Each structure stands twice: as C-alpha cells, then as structure tokens.
C-alpha cells in the first residue's frame, strides 16, 4: 500500500519502519494504552507486534497511516488504520491511536473521516466496523463523530467493549 492522504490539517502517510520507534514510544505512555490489551512495555513481544503490523501487507486499499500535522510534517502524532478485523477479517475495521499531546484536538476524527471516505469511495467497501473499550471516552467520541453507529456491548480480549459499524448507506446519508 502506497496511498498518501491529506486533510485540511493533516498528512496521512503509510506507516513504515521509519515510524517504528515513535509507535513504541507512544505505546509506552500508560495513558495511551490503558484501555488496550497487550504487553505495551517495549519488550520483545510488544516490539514484534508493532513490527509485524508495520511490515504486513494488508492489501492495496488497507493498512496503517502515520498521522502528521501539515504545520509540523515530521512530528509523529499517531496512526489511523483500516485493516481486516483483528488482522484476519473478513470484516474491515477502523482504528486510531494518538500520542497524548494530540488528544482533544480533533486529529483522530479528522484522520478517521478521511480514511472512511477512502474506504467507501476508493476501496468500495459496503461496511466498516470499529470497537473501543467501554470506558475509553475519547475513542468512543471519535467513533460517533466519524459516523459509526453503536451496535452492541460486548467483550474484546476479555475487556468490556462497545462495537460500532458504518454501512455505505450510513456514509451516503452523512454526505447529503
């Protein structure tokens, strides 16, 4: 995947090994990963997980994009993803993660909106899913702002989660 995107304020570049250390550093902030299962300790398992997600080919239209502000194009702010659910599918899911200094500024919503647009208009998908920990108010707000509809409460890897979806009809209705 070599798709680059822009929004009014952001640059979205395919995430590469150039972004590896910035991703690890972001994950080491316990506030960033407090609602996420996994070993976020900088150890071998953590590093291998991040490396595998960076190096994996998710297909022509899917992947992870590193987020940068146009005003500071070398300052890593986080990532947004559009990949097969849990990396295996068949459903396609959106995700996002930001460094703490980027929280509360509309960055995740702006980046996610652009990737949603790509998913429906560029990749031609019919449905996208997303989930977030039930207490992660920031991610839940992003999902709603972007246009995801709440579907159900459940669990993800043993953690209380809220599950969302957006269909092509939902996307089209928001564009009118």
Q: Where would I find each of the regions flagged by the language model?
A:
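GNAT-family acyltransferases
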Residues: 1-101, 117-118, 122, 131-133, ...
